[in-house]
Amino acid sequence: MAEITLDLRALPRAEAYRELQQHVDATLEGIDDEITAMATMSCLVHHAFGHLWTGFYRVVEPGRLLRVGPYQGTLGCLEITFGRGVCGTAAAEDRTVLVEDVETFPGHIACDGRSRSEIVVPVHRPDGSLLAVLDVDSESLAAFGEADREGLERLVAWFRRAR
């Protein structure tokens, strides 16, 4: 398969995520490496929607510390502690966090001052343990909704499947 990225901004979000899911699954067919998958997903999600920042923060000390992993965009924060900011909150509470206006989120970490909204999705290994979080930032307020939550949660389910 040729390595291509899709621009899906013109499609309704739910339809765009269905197309993106098929593209991610086809691209990662036969791959069992988590870092390769993170890099690939970051690229494909980022270019599909034209986000400000798209990437993973990996759990390096369970329950305590996240460290930047593969991403697309400007320089990311290098480390985030559990419970701090949107990423740390999603990791500590093991749940997707969708923030329409980052200025209203207590303790928001501004890695890039242009970020206005954010969604962070927990990523689990096949044994259910937390591997990372997927962080997506936008320059627009309220850029993310339920279609994004559902679509991104389905995408990162790739990591739960045993290989």
Language model segments and positions:
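A short, aliphatic-rich beta-strand micro-motif
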Residues: S117-R125
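Regulatory sensory and allosteric helical modules in signal-transduction proteins
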Residues: V59, R64-G113
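Intrinsically disordered, low-complexity terminal regulatory regions
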Residues: M1-L75, R154-R163
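A generic structural motif
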Residues: S140-A142
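Sensory-domain boundary capping and coupling elements
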Residues: H124-S138
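A generic structural signal for residues located within well-ordered alpha-helices
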Residues: D33-T36, F82, S115, A147
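Short hydrophobic/aromatic beta-strand element in the GNAT-like acyltransferase core
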Residues: W53, V120, V133
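Well-ordered alpha/beta subsegment
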Residues: G128, F144-E146, G151, R161
